[in-house]
Amino acid sequence: MCWRIGNGNHQTELYYRSATGNRDKIKLDINCLSRCHVYEPVVRDARNPFLPDDVFSVRMLSEYELFGAKLKALLERNTPRDIFDAYTMEQKGLYRVDESVSLIRKCIAYYLSLSRGVDIEQALESIRKRPIQDFKKQLFPMLKTGYGFVDRDLMTSEAVKCVSRFLSFTENETAYLEAAKTGEYRPDLLFEGDSAERIAENPAAKFYITKGA
């Protein structure tokens, strides 16, 4: 096992033989910067798919933070997998209540400030124009057998509809993003209380926004 060490993260790959005899891998990515999360983690019960009676507890990120980060990744990367996730969210009618929209929108703004910069209109256009060949190569082989036909145009339009619902930033959220562009970290413009305190000294913010200042 060989670790690849980058700026604030360590990566490696573990290879194994699956139950069908195929060679597969698990990719480990340890991010040493993104260790201060916005919302309090939650504990959920998980079930072993091979042993139905085997239930165990797992500590995980808040669903709002998970989906906020996922939608930020969609804007940044526009990969077929990200598009499919947003399409699924829209098809299932998830997160339509004002409170959940606000919680996710704040996370999108926060994680956008920790990225290399995203032109939102250009990102939405890239989603719309993602070639069908990319879906055939990168997404369709990952779907369960018998999933059924997936319409690329429907998928991309639903993904754009989904993420657009979370992009109407408030005045404070816009002010936060503008401050971040100038190297000023102002989490108080996004959050208050425990959330603001939790990310006040986030090393990722110092690395990406204030450049270590």
Predicted regions and their residues:
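Structured mid-to-C-terminal alpha-helical surface segments
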Residues: 1-213
